[in-house]
């Protein structure tokens, strides 16, 4: 929010070897009117314009961009790997065997199989939920056998001591959930998938069998299958963490095998970003298709929505893409490598400065609202696109007064998104003619905030896009659950008042919890049968897998100085055996070769890594855009400083 890299005003950058978008264009900051006029001059009817969406932007913004450029010219702004993984996940959630659970459902599971994920670093809230999940079965046993009321937490904790419910983890490296796991299996992604397929076969003989499985894995698969089969609420968790479609399909097979007898099994997928699933459901072409379009001369102008391609694709490929395109327009809130190459940069608000909708990994549509307003040239992403469409005479944009209107058109184009209309009241919603106040009653000190400038309190900002007001004034009762801005009740402080907003203590909010599920699985998808071969490690080439870090791997949070201090520096992780095999004993650094790119990285010893596997931190500054899993070569170096060659 307060980063020095925030983009606060439109900017025009003239290329030295390409014609400008407008003959009167001048380099430097520009007004919103001027920059729209410049863009209008080039985005004429028949121009070859493509749009690249964003998994961290709202459904409204992505759909607006898709409408501007047309469905055939809309590309999902994900890496090729994430595109394949998210397409597979979306299809399984639509047609698969089991529903996706909410966080509360995860807490209530009584047996869990995690396949391929480091949840603490990739989905930390889910990891926290699992720490509560493993207490579920011991608590139920204590309540049933000892007749202890579940609300009597001290007695329940004394009764269960350190007992834990069954949690099985299969991951490419040791995770921080190992202390609560009944068993942990560390292996390459293909071997993780083979274990998953074997568990599915143990649960249902109709599922494809795995040939050549070592005896210890046969025994482990039988153990996992037996526990899941006896559970009342089994849960399978997988996702995009280890970058393997086979792992995702194996998790689907396990869930299908559990559901064959009507068992209420659930299947949860972790996804990379806040709206990754929403973008996948919206649909579009891959980033590789966009690169080919530009290379073949089929692209005049590229409009990028809240996306830094240098984090998703190797730098050389992005450089070629931006060179092949005649003009590049970037809509973003934070400057990066991509905005530095854009001819036109349009500043958009962050999640705290705009309204919109997103779809989480459960498939639940959720609405977010402005926390505060701003008084500069920033706009919501969809507003820039709408204003540009209006200047071009696009009829759809004429009726887009706010997010509600865009969602109405989205639902008309994609009926499966109809629950988006129900996730929050429309912008015109009022209770007794009043808006819902954002500010709590204790915000009365606001009158002194600007007293050094003027003793006259300024008029609160208007918000025509939501039923909320930027003031204390408004309806004082309980609003609909999706519009609750704070919890307070007489005699109850802060979040302690939550029980006054619930149907019952610990239950859902009155009127239902916010959000609506978009997807219910049809169950018509059969078993996947393409089982990968066992991983064969080679001494001259290793499989490089991503290591995620809760502090540092996420694109925007790492820009915060506090988070950046906790983020690790780039490294290459190896086990002790391969350090010796590769001649790295005593070496501080190693050279990693991925294709034509060479990285000099400090060596980090991780004894739990399987043979033939090495790891690098995903998304860490200095390693952005590195596409893994991938095969790579590692060799000793004598240089004393890390870097990229």
Predicted feature residues:
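Non-catalytic, well-ordered alpha-helical segments in soluble enzyme domains
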Residues: 381-401
């Amino acid at each position: 929010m307060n980063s020095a890299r925030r983009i606060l005003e439109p900017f025009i950058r003239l290329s030295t070897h390409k014609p400008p978008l407008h003959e009167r264009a001048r380099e430097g900051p520009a007004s919103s009117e001027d920059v729209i006029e410049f863009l209008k001059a080039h985005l004429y009817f028949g121009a070859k314009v493509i749009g690249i969406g964003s998994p961290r932007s709202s459904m409204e913004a992505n759909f607006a961009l898709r409408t501007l450029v047309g469905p055939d010219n809309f590309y999902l702004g994900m890496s090729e790997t994430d595109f394949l993984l998210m397409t597979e996940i979306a299809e399984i959630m639509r047609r698969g065997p089991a529903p996706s659970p909410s966080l509360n459902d995860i807490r209530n599971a009584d047996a869990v199989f995690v396949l391929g994920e480091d949840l603490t670093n990739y989905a930390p809230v889910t990891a926290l939920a699992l720490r509560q999940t493993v207490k579920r079965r011991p608590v139920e046993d204590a309540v049933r056998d000892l007749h202890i009321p579940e609300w009597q937490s001290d007695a329940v904790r004394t009764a269960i001591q350190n007992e834990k419910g069954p949690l099985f983890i299969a991951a490419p490296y040791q995770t921080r959930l190992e202390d609560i796991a009944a068993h942990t299996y560390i292996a390459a992604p293909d071997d993780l998938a083979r274990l998953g397929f074997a568990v599915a076969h143990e649960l249902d003989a109709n599922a494809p069998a795995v040939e050549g499985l070592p005896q210890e894995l046969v025994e482990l698969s039988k153990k996992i299958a037996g526990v899941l089969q006896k559970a009342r609420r089994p849960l399978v968790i997988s996702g995009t963490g280890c970058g393997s479609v086979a792992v995702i399909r194996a998790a689907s097979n396990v869930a299908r095998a559990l559901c064959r007898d009507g068992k209420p099994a659930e299947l949860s997928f972790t996804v990379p970003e806040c709206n990754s699933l929403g973008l996948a459901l919206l649909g579009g072409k891959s980033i590789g298709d966009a690169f080919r379009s530009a290379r073949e001369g089929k692209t005049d102008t590229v409009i990028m929505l809240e996306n830094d391609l240098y984090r998703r694709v190797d730098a050389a490929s992005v450089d070629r893409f931006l060179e092949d395109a005649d003009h590049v327009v970037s809509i973003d809130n934070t400057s990066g490598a991509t905005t530095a190459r854009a001819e036109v940069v349009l500043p958009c608000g962050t999640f705290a400065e705009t309204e919109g909708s997103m779809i989480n990994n459960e498939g639940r549509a959720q609405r977010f609202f402005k926390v505060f307003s701003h008084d500069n040239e920033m706009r919501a992403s969809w507003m820039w696109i709408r204003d540009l469409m209006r200047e071009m005479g696009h009829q759809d944009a004429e009726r887009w007064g706010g997010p509600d209107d865009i969602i109405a058109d989205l639902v008309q184009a994609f009926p499966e998104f109809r629950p988006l209309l129900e996730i929050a009241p429309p912008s015109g919603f009022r209770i007794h003619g009043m808006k819902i106040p954002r500010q709590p009653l204790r915000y009365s000190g606001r009158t002194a905030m600007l007293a050094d400038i003027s003793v006259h309190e300024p008029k609160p900002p208007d918000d025509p896009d939501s039923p909320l007001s930027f003031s204390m004034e408004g309806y004082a009762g309980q609003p609909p659950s999706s519009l609750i801005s704070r919890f307070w009740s007489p005699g109850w402080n802060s979040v302690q008042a939550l029980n006054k907003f619930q149907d019952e203590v610990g239950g859902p909010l009155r009127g239902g919890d916010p959000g609506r599920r978009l997807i219910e699985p049809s169950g018509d998808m059969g078993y996947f049968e393409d089982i990968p071969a066992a991983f064969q490690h080679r001494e001259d080439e290793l499989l490089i897998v991503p290591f995620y870090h809760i502090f540092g791997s996420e694109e925007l949070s790492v820009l915060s100085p506090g988070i950046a201090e906790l983020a690790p520096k780039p490294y290459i992780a190896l086990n002790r055996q391969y350090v010796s095999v590769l001649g790295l004993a005593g070496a501080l650094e190693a050279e990693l070769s991925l294709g034509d790119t060479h990285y000099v990285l400090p060596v980090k010893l991780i004894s739990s890594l399987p043979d033939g596997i090495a790891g690098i931190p995903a998304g860490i500054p200095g390693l952005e855009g590195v596409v893994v899993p991938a095969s790579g070569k590692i060799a000793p170096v004598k240089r004393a400083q890390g870097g990229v060659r």
